[in-house]
Amino acid sequence: MIKAAISGGTTPQAREILKILINHPDVEIVCVNAPEAEGMLLSQVHRGLRGETFMRFTSQMPIDDIDVLFMADTEPGASMKFMATHSVPEGLKIIDLSPDFREESLNDAESPGVYALPEPHRKPLVRGATRASMPGPLASAVLPALLPLAKNLLLNSTIHINAVQAEPQAEPGEPLALLEHEEDAEIRGALGTLQASFHSEMLYVVTAGGWQNGLAATVYMESAVSVNEIEKLYEEFFSDHSFTLVADTLPTLMEVAGTNKCIIHLQKSDPWLVINVAIDDKIKGAAGSAVHVMNLMFGLQERVGLMLKSH
């Protein structure tokens, strides 16, 4: 069994990781670290776990007795602080959901980390990687929408990204980002690994949706390539990836809710190529991809623990 621990144990990301790992056949959860909630039952904070586990939060981190650590605190600086205050044993696999090391993992050849979007980076994850820096939720949707174009050197015009995502603390329709976005650097970095010539302008409009989970994005740009040719590029790029699907109808949030799926739809209205994409930002955009990455790092079948569940 893989012995797993979670830091940042009271976060929504930790809750979703726990919900997946509790039913994962190859994982034993040995520690959920949250000093601020020490001694409390997990279910007192994460109400969806009532009756599923009787574990309690702890301030301890048995770092020498675990195989994988999920760092679930997404506040900037949280993972850097953890790494600076703990002696990490060689061989411990770390899956980091914070933004702290994303750009380093993309831009620094000496970095021990892998930018862990599973679709383009499966090989380094299965070939001995010990640190994985998970993409942000918007990047988790936008990159699958654009990577097949980058691979074929087709990102040569301004890219417009209109997205609506769950944001419980904001009013529906409230702007979250206009023109610029905090995940722009990692999106550009990941695209640049496939298309070194990529320097196109990227313009963002991101608003809050009136729901708890889910991110829907429309990405559009000018393109001279026919939609049939583009569909072939996408089908080829994702042909051996279990969770990213190219659909012939517009994706809905209902299709992806509670799943690790990313559904993409392509259409053309010359000269515009329009790409619609939908994910569950708490699962595919965070916890589900983190477990997917763990499966790859430990040589498991990538769908283990992530199959569609009844509700």
Language model features with spans:
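N-terminal Rossmann-like NAD(P) cofactor-binding subdomain of oxidoreductases
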Residues: 1-179, 197-199, 267-269
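Short, solvent-exposed beta-strand edge segments and adjacent coil->beta transition regions
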Residues: 129, 214-218, 272-274
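Contiguous C-terminal substrate-recognition/catalytic subdomains in enzyme active sites
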Residues: 62, 172-261
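Short C-terminal domain-edge/linker segments immediately following a structured domain
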Residues: 35-37, 59-65, 101-104, 164, ...
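C-terminal active-site/capping subdomain that shapes the small-molecule cofactor and substrate pocket
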Residues: 220-311
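Short, surface-exposed acidic/glycine-rich loop or hinge patches that mediate macromolecular interfaces
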Residues: 11, 136, 209, 224, ...
